[in-house]
């Protein structure tokens, strides 16, 4: 066992769970719940570092770049999950937010042994995407030293991309490799070394923050409404209708009519209702202001 493993919080034993195998089920659950409560406070201390990643992503995506997550195991699966949720939630192109996982698609469903140990393979898989200076590449590694992930961020840096990382140990190897490190220590796991637990929760919450705050920065919300939702199923069509009603105060019938004329696009429908425009006029108005509803409907920004 090397010194890095000895120092890693994610590999440490949790004194509170040393008798785990002797506890009644309810006590096991209480213990896990208590430990999970440590996660938000641990994240809170790193909000400025997370904000720096978001600001870089907003800048890069605004210039046509991509947000690329890369991880192995649980970390990789969470990155793929977050990326996959962006198109239906924000109508993004599937290439705008991308998730890479060591071992490829198969690794989403079952472990691919040894995949995470190949740094060269990580670099090769990133290079397939031809990263550039407008891209932001975020390495996800609970330990902060997964070779495949380190290989990815090194390749990203060589290509001139902005690099970031999210890990759950202090003074992690990957932190010294990236421009924007995020280190969140939520303490050792209830089940020693099982980083699918608190470390996984840390990464899920941070990814939620990165993607959501980035999309807010790109103008894909109006207030707290997901006005760029893609109405690709009945639930989302109903949501789009509710969003138009909430944003404008219009009736259900008026929202349905506006959405029909807008081709299901909630942003267009909102501008139509608020400004009394046709769908064509509303689309043109949104195009003038980069698709930001707040600016589109603000009288101070309307052309005289």
UniProtKB/Swiss-Prot annotation:
This is N-acetylmuramic acid 6-phosphate etherase. The keyword Plastid does not apply. Pathway: Amino-sugar metabolism; N-acetylmuramate degradation. The active site is at 85 (proton donor), 116. It comes from the Bacteria. HAMAP family: MurQ. Specifically catalyzes the cleavage of the D-lactyl ether substituent of MurNAc 6-phosphate, producing GlcNAc 6-phosphate and D-lactate. Its EC number is 4.2.1.126. InterPro entries: Etherase_MurQ, Glucokinase_regulatory_CS, MURQ/GCKR, SIS_dom, SIS_dom_sf. It catalyses: N-acetyl-D-muramate 6-phosphate + H2O = N-acetyl-D-glucosamine 6-phosphate + (R)-lactate. One of its GO terms (biological process) is peptidoglycan turnover. GO terms for molecular function: carbohydrate derivative binding; carbon-oxygen lyase activity; ether hydrolase activity. CDD domains: SIS_Etherase. Keywords: Carbohydrate metabolism, Lyase. Belongs to the GCKR-like family. MurNAc-6-P etherase subfamily. Residues 57-220 form the SIS domain. Coiled coil: none annotated. Pfam families: GKRP_SIS_N (PF22645). A lyase-type mechanism (elimination/hydration) is suggested for the cleavage of the lactyl ether bond of MurNAc 6-phosphate, with the formation of an alpha,beta-unsaturated aldehyde intermediate with (E)-stereochemistry, followed by the syn addition of water to give product. The lineage of its organism: Bacteria, Bacillati, Actinomycetota, Actinomycetes, Propionibacteriales. It is an enzyme of class 4 (lyase). PANTHER family: GLUCOKINASE REGULATORY PROTEIN (PTHR10088:SF4).
């Amino acid at each position: 066992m090397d010194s890095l493993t000895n120092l890693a919080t994610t590999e440490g034993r949790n004194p509170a769970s040393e008798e785990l195998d002797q506890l009644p089920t309810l006590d096991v659950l209480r213990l896990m719940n208590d430990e999970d409560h440590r996660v938000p406070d641990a994240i809170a201390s790193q909000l400025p570092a997370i904000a720096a990643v978001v600001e870089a992503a907003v800048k890069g995506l605004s210039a046509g770049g991509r947000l690329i997550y890369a991880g192995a195991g649980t970390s990789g699966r969470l990155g793929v999950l977050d990326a996959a949720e962006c198109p239906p939630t924000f109508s993004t192109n599937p290439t705008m937010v991308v998730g890479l996982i060591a071992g490829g698609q198969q690794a989403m469903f079952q472990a691919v042994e040894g995949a995470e140990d190949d740094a060269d393979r990580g670099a090769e898989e990133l290079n397939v995407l031809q990263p550039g200076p407008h891209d932001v590449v975020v390495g996800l590694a609970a330990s902060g030293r997964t070779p495949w992930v380190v290989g990815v961020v090194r390749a990203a840096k060589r290509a001139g991309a902005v690099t970031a990382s999210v890990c759950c140990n202090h003074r992690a190897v990957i932190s010294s490799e990236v421009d924007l490190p995020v280190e969140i220590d939520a303490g050792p796991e209830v089940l020693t070394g099982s980083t699918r637990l608190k470390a996984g929760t840390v990464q899920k919450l941070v990814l939620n923050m990165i993607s959501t705050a980035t999309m807010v920065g790109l103008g894909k919300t109006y207030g707290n409404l997901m006005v760029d939702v893609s109405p690709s199923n009945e639930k989302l069509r109903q949501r789009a209708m509710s969003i138009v009603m909430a944003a404008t105060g219009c009736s259900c019938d008026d929202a349905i009519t506006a959405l029909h004329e807008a081709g299901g696009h909630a942003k267009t429908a909102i501008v139509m209702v608020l400004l009394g425009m046709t769908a064509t006029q509303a689309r043109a108005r949104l195009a003038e202001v980069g698709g930001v509803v707040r600016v589109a409907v603000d009288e101070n920004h309307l052309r005289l």
